[in-house]
Design a protein with these regions (language model features):
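All-alpha amphipathic helical-bundle segments outside canonical DNA-binding/catalytic cores
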Residues: 125, 270-282
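Active-site activation/catalytic loop segments of kinase-like enzymes and analogous catalytic loops
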Residues: 230-268, 284-300
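Conserved NTP-binding catalytic cores of kinases and kinase-like/nucleotidyltransferase enzymes
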Residues: 1-87, 213-215, 329-333
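ATP/Mg2+ or Mg2+-diphosphate-binding catalytic cores
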Residues: 288-333
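Active-site acidic catalytic loop and adjacent metal/ATP-binding pocket
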Residues: 33-44, 48, 82, 185-231, ...
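A glycine-centered beta->alpha junction motif in the catalytic cores
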Residues: 54, 88, 105-119, 159-167, ...
């Protein structure tokens, strides 16, 4: 998180926001990379409080996020339900000079982060369920209409991370911005259709869902934007997994991808030709993550080890960047 934003978040603002959702006790900080995320209790129930600075998302953008999230939940997507404040609103606004924070609250996702070392959790059945949920979201988003909102969610290429890449990167990493520009131009040549482009979560990975008894509950829709479906799939791939340092990683990756796509195809069809550019999409996601790390001051935070991993992959490459995803998919048919 940028230091100037941290300095704006007064302790009494956190207390006031939690009070709007009938908090009892102290709100405990869980995360402070893009938003300030807290856990609190209300009526003996675990809840999540999120405080977002207006420089990250406006209140209308957050309302658009919640509108889509509620639509997905109403149509069967397992996700953390937004909670109305005691004043009957999904968002509460707190001015801080010329800017403001927006508070939102959610039900706590049941379960825990998935244990990728436990074969009882990280297995073919889970991979298929994971893909099925993603396919269902892509199918549902084709029918979602946001025309009733004051402001829609942004398109992915409008993200400040991409618009100001060179401003965030240190001089020795400016090459990243040039490569991102080339990849953006490649996607810019594609013609968006309802079957390939729409409003997507944008950050479905093991840090943004909980599991319990094999069932997933998604959360953190903060990055949702209008984007290519293939980019949404790329984020779900285990790019930063430890498996690639072990023997037999290719067989495990193939199992993951084939089962994931089998589940995906149960709910939505994506033309196989998109799988040919999945390596480029994964490369792009890695570079975007690197820029985002600098934008959120991650190199100087407790998440520095993640930044170092992303930088290493950006500099040295990754097996994903040459993997034959289409071939793996077609061999599973």
């Amino acid at each position: 998180m940028e230091e100037r934003i941290v300095s704006l978040l007064r302790p009494e603002l956190i207390t006031e926001a939690a009070h709007h959702w009938n908090a009892t006790g102290k709100a405990v900080l869980l995360d402070d990379v893009s938003n300030f995320v807290y856990e609190f209790s209300s009526q003996d129930m675990r809840r999540i409080l999120r405080l977002t600075h207006s420089s990250h998302h406006t209140e209308d953008e957050i309302i658009a996020e919640l509108d889509w999230l509620i639509y997905l939940i109403q149509n069967g997507i397992p996700a953390s339900q937004p909670i109305l404040s005691q004043d009957g609103r999904y968002t509460e606004r707190y001015p801080t000079g010329e800017s403001y924070f927006v508070a939102t609250a959610f039900e706590y996702a049941p379960g825990h982060f998935i244990d990728k070392t436990d074969p009882r959790e990280w297995n073919s059945q889970f991979f298929r369920t994971f893909g099925r949920i993603m396919g269902r979201m892509h199918s549902l988003t084709k029918h979602y209409n946001a025309d009733h909102l004051r402001q829609k969610r942004p398109h992915w290429y409008e993200d400040v991370i991409l618009q100001r890449a060179e401003d965030y990167l240190p001089a020795e990493q400016r090459w990243v911005a040039a490569e991102v520009e080339k990849l953006l131009a490649q996607f810019g040549q594609k013609m968006p259709t309802v079957d390939s482009y729409g409003l997507v979560h944008g950050d479905v990975n093991p840090t943004n869902f909980h599991v319990r008894d094999g069932q997933l509950t998604l959360f953190d829709f903060d990055d949702c934007s209008y984007n290519w479906f293939i980019n949404d799939i790329a984020v779900a791939m285990p790019l930063y997994s430890d498996m690639f340092a072990e023997e037999g990683w290719e067989a495990r990756l193939t199992e993951f991808f084939q089962q994931y796509m089998r589940g995906y195809e149960e709910e939505n069809h994506l033309d196989e030709s998109w799988l040919e550019i999945l390596p480029d999409s994964l490369r792009l996601q890695c570079l975007i993550n690197l820029i985002a790390c600098h934008a959120s001051n991650v190199p100087n935070s407790r998440y520095r080890s993640f930044y170092e991993l992303v930088l290493k992959i950006a500099q040295q490459g990754h097996p994903f960047f040459t993997y034959n995803f289409r071939g793996a998919y077609e061999s599973a048919l």
